[in-house]
């Protein structure tokens, strides 16, 4: 029996940044897969490389960043920039990614106020991508935008389309970001810290919305977060990142109830437990994250 290919396969992905201090190897040969209809959580503290991995996938690295090795097989096609060497080839790569970004792969960013243009109406920001990828009329794009706003729970969408980002609350702006991400029925949705800037009540609402989307869609989803509570409630599998490496990968139950790697165990032990004796202090992970300028080939947690 032939196994179906995963929607996304990352194999040996390496990304580095040129800095004044030297070369920072931000990703050191990471591997993971995402299947259709699956939710993968990528968890790690700040600087672990989790967002760099997604920017590498989307072709959105800063000018000093480069994917130096690895394959990124999306829907059966390698979209890694590694094989594009000449100026002409790099233009071909950018043309390919422009067709994929926002269409087949979409991204939900963590700070909606920074992502949304403050001087452009919500209607224009929502319909721009729809018209670019679907080649539809202005009226058809507007109807799709209204439909999407209803889907993500924004009341009176017809009138609110004419408003600007500052006229919406933080939670509503995040819903708009999610609506934009869903506009072209993507095969893969990447959510980068989708609840970080929101209060607890709004976080729960956004998580419920993401859960509903994953249940009703066949799209694969990647959730990037440092919040283990988010992945526990939403994800099928979890990859734990540290120092540019994936330290451990498993189902949500395996990671939470049977962790293998010392870093994963330390991460779980450092979480406040509502059932624990509150007189006992939290157990922080000792030491500091490794300096990626100096880290060799050893396990970053062992360093």
Predicted regions and their residues:
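A short, surface-exposed alpha-helical micro-motif characterized by mixed small hydrophobic
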Residues: 231-233
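ABC ATPase NBD coupling module
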Residues: 79-106, 132, 255-259, 292-296
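A short, proline-enriched helix->beta-strand linker immediately N-terminal to the Walker B motif
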Residues: 183-187
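Short catalytic/signature loops enriched in Gly
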Residues: 81, 155-158, 251-303
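Conserved ABC transporter NBD signature motif
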Residues: 67-81
């Amino acid at each position: 029996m032939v196994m179906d290919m995963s929607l996304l396969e990352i194999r040996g992905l390496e990304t580095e940044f040129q800095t004044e201090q030297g070369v920072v190897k931000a990703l050191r040969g990471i591997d993971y897969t995402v299947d259709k209809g699956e939710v993968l959580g990528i968890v790690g503290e700040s600087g672990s490389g989790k967002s760099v991995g997604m920017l590498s996938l989307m072709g959105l690295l800063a000018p000093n960043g480069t994917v130096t090795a690895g394959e990124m097989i999306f829907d059966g096609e390698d979209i890694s920039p590694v094989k594009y060497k000449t100026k002409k080839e790099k233009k071909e790569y950018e043309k390919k990614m422009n067709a994929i970004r926002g269409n087949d792969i979409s991204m939900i960013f963590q700070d909606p106020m920074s992502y949304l243009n403050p001087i452009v109406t919500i209607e224009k920001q929502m319909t721009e991508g729809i018209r670019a990828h679907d080649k539809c009329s202005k009226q058809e794009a507007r109807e799709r935008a209204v439909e999407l706003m209803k889907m993500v729970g924004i009341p009176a969408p017809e009138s609110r389309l004419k408003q600007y980002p500052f006229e919406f609350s933080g939670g509503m702006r995040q819903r708009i970001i999610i609506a934009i991400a869903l506009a072209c029925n993507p095969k893969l949705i990447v959510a980068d810290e989708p609840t970080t800037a929101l209060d607890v009540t709004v976080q729960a609402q956004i998580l419920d919305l993401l859960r509903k989307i994953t249940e009703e869609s066949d799209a694969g989803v990647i959730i990037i977060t440092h919040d283990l509570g988010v992945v526990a409630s939403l994800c099928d599998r979890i990859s734990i990142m540290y120092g540019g490496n994936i330290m451990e990968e498993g189902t949500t139950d395996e990671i939470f109830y049977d962790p293998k790697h010392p870093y994963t165990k330390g991460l779980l032990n450092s979480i406040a437990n509502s059932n624990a004796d509150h007189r006992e202090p939290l157990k922080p992970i000792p030491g500091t994250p490794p300096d990626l300028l100096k880290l060799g080939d050893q396990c970053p947690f062992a360093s």
